[in-house]
Structures are given as structure tokens and as C-alpha cells.
Amino acid sequence: MNETDFSDVLKAGVTRFQQHIFPKRRLLFEKLAKAQKPEALFLTCADSRVIPSLITHTGPGQLFVERNPGNLVPIYRKEAVGVSASIEYAVTALRVEHIVICGHSDCGVIKGILHPDSVTKLPAVARWTEFGMPARDALFAEYPHLPEAEQLPILTEFNVLNQIDNLYTHPSVQQALQEERLTIHGWVYHIESGEVREYNADFNRFVSLSGD
């Protein structure tokens, strides 16, 4: 399929939305046109296979979504950073009650963090992966002899936990936690099975959200 063909697909999708979906949910969109009141900030990867509303079965207005390669959260600094602005706006202005940091299987950025030489020809990506290097360091410190085949899934989990640590450096998050109005969740979505695993602090590991 060439670029022109896919442009036609996108346009046809808009037409179907306007003719078949929007009319059935007109009242919802009229309400949303006046204001938004999302219940969660969903911070995940920009990967095209990860669709937050599909995974969580949520509708328009329920999730405030921040996406970037590798679902990374830079440590807070006063200089303007897109991720930081999204966090601050969601927590302080919209007063979301939950933040979900959601990694996923087969993540290209996590592969780049694991193998930095693989992204040397992508200088912007290489610089971006630096925000995930503490997770890589933690992986090799805890599992120095881990077989290569097992490194990627564990690093994916370590990265989620590392980004939660970075989240705690943001003043808006600190304030909301102090006020006991915010809960933070760490998830990993497995594309091949549809399973979502959440970090459980009591067990110190990721467990299935479905309870299996």
C-alpha cells in the first residue's frame, strides 16, 4: 500500500466516524466540547501497536494520554520539557487521580537502551535513551549473568520502575501524593497475548491484572 492509498484509508475512516460513530455519541461529545475531566494520566510508548483506549476499554474523556518512545519520564527540571508539562497539567490542572506508566513487549527503544550501538545512527533517539540507562545499569547489577534472551523483558519492567522513580521528582506529583489524592501504577502490556501485568510492591514483582 502506497502513501496515497493510506491517505485514502484515513479519510475514509474519518467519514465513517462522522457518519456512524459520532451521531450515536453526540451527547457525550457535546459534553466533552465544554470541558475534560479525565480520571487518569496514561503515560506510554509511541509504538503504533499500543492503543491505550483499546487496552483499557475506555472512552473519550477518560484518559489524558502522554506518549513518547520508550514511555520515558525525564527527571524534573524547570526548563520546558513536553513530558513534564503533560504531567504537571494532568496532575495540577486536571487533578487526575491515577497515573499509569505502561511499557510493552518488543519495545524498540528498550532494545536501544539494552544495545546502545544499535541507535548510533539515530542521534536524537540515542540521546533520548539516556533517560532509560539507569534501568539498564540496575538490570546488569542485579542480574550480571542473565542470558541475553531474558534481558529485554526484564529491562522492560525495570524501565517502568525507573520511570516511576523519575516521576517522584516532579513537584506536582510530590504535592498530589502528599495530599493523598494520587495513585501511581506500573504496567507492562504484552502485545502477543494481550496480557497486562502490574507491579505489586507487596510481592516486589509484576503480576497479571486479570489475577491469573
Where are these regions (language model features)?
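Gly/Ser/Thr-rich loops at beta-strand to alpha-helix junctions
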Residues: D47-R49, H104-V109
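Catalytic core of membrane glycerolipid acyltransferases/transacylases, capturing the structured
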Residues: S48-P69
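Divalent-metal-activated hydrolytic enzyme cores
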Residues: M1-P38, N71-E97, G108-D212
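Short beta-strand segments
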Residues: L43-C45, R67, V100-H104, H185-H190
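Conserved H-X4-D acyltransferase segment
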Residues: Q36-S53
